[in-house]
Design a protein with these regions (language model features):
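Mixed-charge (Asp/Glu-Lys/Arg
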Residues: 1-36, 41-155
Length: 155
């Protein structure tokens, strides 16, 4: 199969997250398209716990990492807001679960390191309207988040 269009990759990631939530007895409901802050509302079956989840998906033919809007670096101060980074692979998918502000700090840290490093010719880098986050920047803490759905607090 050829390269999937970005919108198909994104929607597929949202459905994959909903499916994983369902396997854990958590109801995942997609929000209307273009909701700016989150894609899924997840709730326990008894309705006692609910969280909002933004989903970012990277397909298996992507070798640059997750492309995020620069607004990801704006903290939301909401303990019930999460981001799931989906690494969509041919057979098995990986899900990296973050509280929103934790990912916000990580992405800001990675971007600040990037922007403070001059280009090969010595000139400074210019600010861009997106942020990349990929495996080469992962710490041991990032790897502990793989398929760690307990971070959402439903356990």
């Amino acid at each position: 199969m050829g390269k999937l269009p970005n919108n198909i990759v994104g929607v597929t990631g949202e459905y994959l997250v909903c499916a994983e939530l369902g396997k854990k007895g958590i109801l995942g409901l997609l929000t209307p398209k273009n909701n700016p802050l989150f894609d899924i509302v997840a709730t326990s079956l008894d309705g006692k716990r609910s969280v909002a989840i933004q989903v970012k998906t990277m397909s298996n033919d992507n070798n640059q990492g997750w492309k995020l809007g620069k607004d990801i670096c704006i903290k939301q101060n909401n303990d019930n807001l999460f981001v799931v980074l989906v690494n969509m692979k041919e057979n098995e998918n990986d899900f990296f679960i973050y509280q929103y502000d934790v990912l916000s700090e990580r992405v800001e840290e990675v971007y600040n390191k990037y922007i403070s490093t001059p280009k090969k010719n010595g000139s400074p880098r210019k600010d861009v309207n997106f942020r990349w986050f990929d495996f080469k920047e992962f710490t041991s803490d990032d790897y502990l988040r793989i398929n760690n759905w307990g971070i959402l607090g439903f356990d």
